[in-house]
Regions:
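Short amphipathic alpha-helices and their capping/turn segments at secondary-structure boundaries
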Residues: 1, 37-38, 92-100, 148-155, ...
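An N-terminally biased module of ancient metal coordination in phosphate/nucleic-acid-related enzymes
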Residues: 1-68
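A generic "structured core" feature
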Residues: 2-11, 15, 40-41, 112, ...
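Catalytic metal-binding/acid-base residues of hydrolase active sites
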Residues: 9, 54, 85, 168, ...
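Loop/turn elements at helix/coil->beta-strand transitions in domains of secreted/extracellular proteins
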Residues: 45, 103-105, 160
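Short, electropositive alpha-helical surface patch
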Residues: 58-76, 160-164, 212-222
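Active-site gating/metal-coordination segments in enzymes
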Residues: 61-146, 152-155, 194-203, 207-210
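H/E-rich (His + Asp/Glu) clusters that bind or coordinate divalent metals
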Residues: 171-222
Length: 222
């Protein structure tokens, strides 16, 4: 079966800084396309979508351009979801510097590390709404408790396509369904949202075995 990996990460710590991963031994290392190709060998992955990995803000534009350049090389990278900071007044200027590349598909702002008020700020909704004009989607990277905030953003920008990452990060390991279940049902009624079934095995915790895969499949039914 041919596979499209819709959530690929790459990072080069020799070029860019990702402060969030410094304390995580498994992640605090450079991982390039060559490493990825080795990891997927024999898995029939035909295409991939690179999703930004919350690079430190001073490197945001340079890292986005770097990934877009990689997508022009001989590899399966067919789509790029770039990082962005819609809370800033200069967000449109940033977009104008990266739009036009055929592999650029969307923007993501990691929100699970940010206060909820960031999304309610004067620029955030206005700037996310701009994405409709550029034909770009917006990835919702939120915790389960932030789903109501995400829902408000979705309803405020009806012309923008939203991708809910990792099923809204339910508490899989703790087997706590509610209020995540109620919120996921509400957001599922919005025609401009699709849900990315990703990250659930990781949310199950270690070990990553068949039992946890079965648990992840059960949660994805919602």
């Amino acid at each position: 079966m041919e596979i499209i990996d819709a959530h690929q990460h790459l990072w080069d710590l020799d070029l860019f800084s990702f402060s969030w991963c410094r304390g995580i031994q498994q992640l605090n290392r450079t991982f390039l396309m060559a490493d990825y190709l080795e990891a997927i060998e024999g898995m029939d992955v035909e295409q991939t979508v690179h999703v930004e990995a919350d690079v430190d803000e001073p490197f945001l534009l340079a890292e986005t351009r770097h990934v877009l350049q990689q997508s022009e090389q001989d590899n399966p990278l067919e789509g790029v979801v770039a990082g962005g900071r819609p809370e800033h007044s200069h967000f449109k200027d940033y977009l104008d510097q990266i739009v036009g590349h055929p592999k650029l598909k969307g923007i993501r702002r990691v929100l699970h590390t940010q206060p909820d008020d960031l999304v309610r700020g004067p620029w955030f909704i206005q700037n996310v709404a701009l994405l409709e004009r550029y034909g770009l989607s917006f990835d919702l990277c939120v915790l389960a408790r932030q789903l109501p905030v995400a829902l408000n953003l979705v309803k405020s920008c009806p012309g923008v396509a939203f991708i809910l990452d990792h099923c809204g990060v339910p508490q899989v390991k703790e087997h706590i369904l509610d209020p995540w279940r109620q919120h996921i049902l509400e957001i599922s009624k919005c025609p401009n949202v699709v849900c990315k079934v990703s990250g659930l095995v990781t949310l199950c915790g270690a070990p990553h075995n068949v039992t946890n895969v079965k648990t992840a499949v059960m949660w994805s039914d919602y």
